[in-house]
Amino acid sequence: MTQTLSQLENSGAFIERHIGPDAAQQQEMLNAVGAQSLNALTGQIVPKDIQLATPPQVGAPATEYAALAELKAIASRNKRFTSYIGMGYTAVQLPPVILRNMLENPGWYTAYTPYQPEVSQGRLEALLNFQQVTLDLTGLDMASASLLDEATAAAEAMAMAKRVSKLKNSNRFFVASDVHPQTLDVVRTRAETFGFEVIVDDAQKVLDHQDVFGVLLQQVGTTGEIHDYTALISELKSRKIVVSVAADIMALVLLTAPGKQGADIVFGSAQRFGVPMGYGGPHAAFFAAKDEYKRSMPGRIIGVSKDAAGNTALRMAMQTREQHIRREKANSNICTSQVLLANIASLYAVYHGPVGLKRIANRIHRLTDILAAGLQQKGLKLRHAHYFDTLCVEVADKAGVLARAEAAEINLRSDILNAVGITLDETTTRENVMQLFSVLLGDNHGLEIDTLDKDVAHDSRSIQPAMLRDDEILTHPVFNRYHSETEMMRYMHSLERKDLALNQAMIPLGSCTMKLNSAAEMIPITWPEFAELHPFCPPEQAEGYQQMIAQLADWLVKLTGYDAVCMQPNSGAQGEYAGLLAIRHYHESRNEGHRDICLIPASAHGTNPASAHMAGMQVVVVACDKNGNIDLTDLRAKAEQAGDNLSCIMVTYPSTHGVYEETIREVCEVVHQFGGQVYLDGANMNAQVGITSPGFIGADVSHLNLHKTFCIPHGGGGPGMGPIGVKAHLAPFVPGHSVVQIEGMLTRQGAVSAAPFGSASILPISWMYIRMMGAEGLKKASQVAILNANYIASRLQDAFPVLYTGRDGRVAHECILDIRPLKEETSISELDIAKRLIDYGFHAPTMSFPVAGTLMVEPTESESKVELDRFIDAMLAIRAEIDQVKAGVWPLEDNPLVNAPHIQSELVAEWAHPYSREVAVFPAGVADKYWPTVKRLDDVYGDRNLFCSCVPISEYQ
């Protein structure tokens, strides 16, 4: 036996689990691309002056079991008190059937955003259900398929109110003083960059303030008071003021819909529909508006359309509003939303149905009534007479009450003057209420739940009669059918079967990094130690979170070459926004607030200009040369022209064209020479980690897509995380938080997300990935990602020319296949190829981005050579099919490409095509066949006949 014990322990075992090609496959691919080793290939591709001499010191790799044990020990430092803090976050009961069949199911969490609707009908249906829940509860006409959180939804509502307002000369926005403090914080941050004045006052004084374009009210105030705003909204509408209302999704089950009262926009958090608090996220926000404002709405909207056979099918509607098309003119910079969490909330509503939801809401309210009655009976005073689940209780000995609460492992809301806040939820029991009596009144209170129940059951006046809902909700059959676990399990499986996720095939989307989300990485997110913490609990109860976040931040600092990391942004787009705000505030601190020009290469992702616009900057586009690189001559000219007004450049590296630009350091130097900052978009970090870093290259700030490079799953369109890394001079300007002091952060800036650490409960995924891979594995992952992309490029370049290459004809971690010459010759388009790939069992690469008429392929390091060859074989077979069309064997108007994808029913339908059924549906053979459930979507029909709520159930059968 020649192996040492260390070798037998094999601490790096996970590296081989995560990286798809084994050593033999890697060597075969290296031979195919003409490189001797991974290091040799990297040396050929990455510019010498930016290659790291030593890898980042993030430690040795750990096995899955060792890493899980280590993280479990950290998690155990969190203290699981019962939290009645409220403020938009409550404990929940996630039905186990949803936990097991969705949240823990890679068929749901590894899918991508449904830009290819033919392989996304399942989650599109679940999202349509989410929209229907939103419509029913808000009383409005149009709903989106989720935003990032309630506070950012409020900021989006403000921006939308300005877009649709007829009061074009006004820049004043009114916010009621009893909205949640984190909501006000994020609204103020957004308002500053838009040049809006935010007025905060009692809602009843809004009419005292002149020249207001929009108003934000909260139906159930932050301390619990239910407001009947019917008359006020009517008066505001008569003055052409746009009215937005923040609402509690569970309270809406019982309360009058704000839309019925005249509100233009209604939003809130869907967290309490089954999604754990998770120390702040991720949670989906719901957002609804009047039909007349639909084209001004932010975020994605699911619509009902038809497929090529005339069958009902779903798609993302009105995509021309989105940032990847409208760029700086987009309604919002939002890209990743919260699809997985929206679908949990959607299925929570399906499982409970209207009867179950009313029972839950009524139970919460009854227990709140019982608590209120007992406290009042013993002489305590409630600050509000009307409430749903939250009491504001005036107490003489507040310190004593809080001390007794702490001793009982209870968190009360403590930031209210001379009072405490108590928010009940669906997990609250009669035993909990008795414990609250003891905390507030002492052990000898003598109260009995059943006696109090009889009193309040017949004489509850805590909800005004005018505020009680008088219409039916969730009448669609989908909410009234799947209430047994068997039926629910089968319904969820039927949806999952319609979709294509990583558990079936590679998803080669360029710029998306659809890599493995390992089971070991995912396990900790459902641990109660992480899932059940309130984001505003005392810091001593979250020591495990603080340790885990600090370790992850330290690793990211070392991997990026920056000096500090801020974890708050809960998407890549939010990270961009936060990074640009840091640049803006840095310039302002130097009395250079006039610096507002942001240079952006023509190849940039559409989120870049949209984020720059949101940060109050002017976008100036820098040209690219014929090789796709930034044109240095044009850059110098634009930088010189901007002069003292130059704020920054936003650049992606490797470039969005899939190459390592040789002049990246010179780009940074030019911008710095003119006083600007360098924002390096972290979308392509998967080709940097361990090889180079943004800080080493010369950048000042980057966001990191943890849902790309660091293994948080895409969830079908979210969640994501977009923390920002910054150089020391920008560290004082990263987002802060009005409710929680973020340890180690000296910032005085406002928040960009509702929670201080964004979607904190998914950070363990990235912690696990880095811990298990170690420095060695992380570098190797980047190198194999580069190898896989070059292998695909080399094997396909004769059939589909690679549009841009770097030195020695190499690409980075992705490549762009140019379909335009074939399109000119044959009229077969990139869309036809994308849809035909579905018949071969693949999700399409990224279409027409960053160059129209192309396909961008990113295989990631997780795909084996076997899967890469399967994809390559499919692409070569499709090229042969195009040649058949070109040769006239198949007519242009009737061939397997233009008719793709083909569905199962076509096997037994009348067949009049010039190609066989077998060619249509089994081009890659019968084994493991993926069947799309709809044919190609009719996008024009969908947008011309916009319908964004549930259709009759018969349409799905």
From Swiss-Prot:
| Keyword annotations | Oxidoreductase, Pyridoxal phosphate
Database matches in SUPFAM superfamilies: PLP-dependent transferases
Q: Specify the signal sequence span.
A: none
CDD domains, A to Z? GDC-P
Q: What class of enzyme is it?
A: oxidoreductase
What GO terms describe the biological role, i.e. biological process, of this protein? glycine decarboxylation via glycine cleavage system
The source's domain of life comes to Bacteria
Reaction catalysed by this enzyme = N(6)-[(R)-lipoyl]-L-lysyl-[glycine-cleavage complex H protein] + glycine + H(+) = N(6)-[(R)-S(8)-aminomethyldihydrolipoyl]-L-lysyl-[glycine-cleavage complex H protein] + CO2
Say if the entry is tagged with keyword Oxidoreductase. yes
MF GO annotations: glycine binding; glycine dehydrogenase (decarboxylating) activity; pyridoxal phosphate binding
Any one GO CC term of this protein is:
glycine cleavage complex
Recorded hits in Pfam families, A to Z, give: GcvP2_C, GDC-P
Record's keyword annotation contains Coiled coil: no
The N6-(pyridoxal phosphate)lysine modification is found at K708
Q: Any idea of its EC number?
A: 1.4.4.2
Function field: The glycine cleavage system catalyzes the degradation of glycine. The P protein binds the alpha-amino group of glycine through its pyridoxal phosphate cofactor; CO(2) is released and the remaining methylamine moiety is then transferred to the lipoamide cofactor of the H protein.
Q: How does it assemble?
A: The glycine cleavage system is composed of four proteins: P, T, L and H.
Task: Report the family membership.
Answer: Belongs to the GcvP family.
Xref: NCBIfam families: gcvP, PRK04366.1
Q: What is this protein called?
A: Glycine dehydrogenase (decarboxylating)
Starting at the broadest rank, the lineage of the source organism is: Bacteria, Pseudomonadati, Pseudomonadota, Gammaproteobacteria, Enterobacterales
Gene transcribed to yield this protein:
gcvP
